């Protein structure tokens, strides 16, 4: 499954989505910081599977529906940061979809995730990530799962990797930094966690109107 994830910077990069879907032959497109009410039902060959409604910074997932049947989708709230309490509503931080491959009948889970901002502690983000993984498992236990998005976790990534390994998830970072807002500050904010998949690399797409660069990956079911 080919997945692209993109933080739109408060919907600023929304005009790029149709071009991305077509140019990169995307199967699943995961969005963060989108305006759910302004999203089209289709982007080229992709259909809108679901989006958040109550969140100030929306999440959405588009799916190639001629290849994948959309079985179910669900929005999950995770632990709130101080930022979430002050600038509510912002606690819907995972949108997960349960898909079935129309060709081989295999089920997969894909999640679009947006962690608390850098004003929160890494320990809170680790709890949010663990809670998001639990939410995905609740949709379909033992189903291969991949979660992509803006993790807001540019430092001390080895500690996060150790935590994920104990829970059965692997972390894959991008080949280049994904956050480019300031010339003197960039980082690997957007990456991938997965279980039951093999992911060789996570590539970064050219910069657009967002302060994040979109990421692209091909996830193969583990043997």
Locate the predicted segments by residue.
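Acidic/histidine-rich helix-loop elements
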Residues: 3-12, 80-89, 119-121
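Active-site beta-strand/loop signature of hydrolases that rely on acidic residues for catalysis
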Residues: 3-8, 17-42, 62, 97, ...
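Structural motif
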Residues: 10-17, 124-126
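Structural motif corresponding to alpha-helix initiation and N-cap regions
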Residues: 11-15, 56, 91, 186
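Structured beta-strand-rich core segments of catalytic domains in phosphoester-bond hydrolases
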Residues: 28-107, 205-206
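Metal-dependent phosphoester-hydrolase catalytic domains
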Residues: 73, 137-144, 151-223
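Active-site-proximal loop/helix segment associated with metal-binding centers of metalloenzymes
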Residues: 103, 108-118
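Active-site-proximal segments of metal-dependent phosphoesterases and phosphodiesterases across multiple
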Residues: 114-132, 155-164
């Amino acid at each position: 499954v080919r997945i692209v994830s993109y933080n739109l910077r408060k919907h600023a990069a929304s005009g790029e989505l149709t071009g991305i879907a077509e140019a990169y032959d995307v199967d699943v497109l995961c969005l963060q910081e989108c305006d759910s009410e302004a999203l089209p039902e289709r982007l080229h060959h992709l259909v809108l599977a679901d989006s958040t409604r109550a969140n100030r910074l929306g999440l959405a997932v588009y799916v190639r529906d001629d290849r994948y049947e959309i079985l179910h989708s669900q929005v999950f709230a995770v632990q709130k940061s101080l930022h979430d309490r002050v600038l509510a509503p912002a606690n819907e931080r995972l949108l997960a979809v349960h898909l079935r491959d129309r060709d081989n009948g295999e089920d997969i889970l894909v999640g679009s995730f947006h962690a608390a901002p850098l004003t929160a502690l890494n320990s809170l983000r680790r709890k949010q990530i663990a809670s998001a993984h639990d939410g995905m498992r609740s949709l379909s236990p033992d189903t291969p799962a991949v979660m992509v998005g803006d993790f807001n976790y540019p430092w001390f990534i080895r500690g996060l990797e150790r935590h994920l390994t104990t829970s059965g998830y692997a972390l894959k970072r991008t080949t280049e930094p994904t956050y480019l807002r300031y010339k003197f500050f960039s980082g690997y904010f957007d990456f991938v966690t997965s279980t039951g998949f093999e992911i060789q690399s996570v590539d970064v797409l050219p910069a657009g109107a967002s302060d994040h660069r979109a990421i692209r990956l091909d996830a193969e079911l583990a043997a």
